[in-house]
Amino acid sequence: LVTSVAQPGFWYSLVYTLVVLVFGIRRIHRRPTQYVRWQTWTLISIQAIPLFLLPYWILPWLGDLGCFDDGWGRTLADALFPITENYPPGREYWRAFGLILAWPLFFWNVFTDQPMMAWLVISVIQTFVLLPLAIRRWGKGVYCGWICSCGALAETLGDTQRRKMPHGPWTHRLNFVGQFFLLLTLILLEARLWSWCFPDSWLGSWSLSIYHGILHGIPLLSYEWTVDLFFSGILGVGLYWHFSGRVWCRFACPLAALMNIYARFSRFRIIADKKRCISCNLCTAVCHQGIDVMGFAQRGIPVEDPQCVRCSACVEECPTAVLRFGEVDRDGRVVRLDLLEATI
């Protein structure tokens, strides 16, 4: 713990976790539904345990006990948390963030100097196997609304700001920002793979130049500064009080842009009962992803939009209980409704 406290990342993560905890409890009191209670405590638990205690206390403590000195413990630690002199605990325990934050949101375990096969396998399984399967059943919100640390802050600290998200066709054009960032990560990935596979060839050298140029490149204009720090951190959080807590998630997150593709094949829907809809527009107003929920409800058709993160605000705010989370079959027929009650 002493070595962890010496790291700036420890204090950043501590403050982040405390904010999620405090504002999460406030959210539970503000929205006393079964769904919000389970969702919020899940977000708090994930932020507190695997995203804070694990890298900054549990793993360093196990290392001090000698659990990673020999045997299978050392084999596992060497594969996931390499020994380093540049990180106070002696191993790169911060890479444990990659157990929760999938590529390309957390890209540092993939974009390494030498290939780390364990993390490459984990990242492939996370991003291209587990996420598509989970989203197929529960929608994009299974990750954005229940697991991701960005979503945790948005649903807790940003909960009272959700009505500030701009709506309308022009806002959808801003989604290209996330698509562009996703394209950059794919270019980075391809360049990194070519440089690994052909290190001594002109193709490998050229790919390596592209990789370093985009990732590190011009100071303050590189991917690591512009996207990872400015857009996701400074701008994303700074705009909470102007355009809601989901600015980064909706417009700029490269992982969300990828999951939008997966979500188009999802069976998750917000089921609407047209007979009960009074066109009050409350459901659309509280959507911090900019979805025209009322437009679907007025027509009595299930809400189908890849932007939905299952926050449940529209379901809870509806005064006539028009909306419910559910699942449809291939023909669009409702086959299942969520067991967790999202209305008061």
Question: Model features per residue range: what roles?
Answer:
Residues 1-301, 306-307, 313-316, 320-344:
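Non-ligating segments of multi-cofactor redox enzymes
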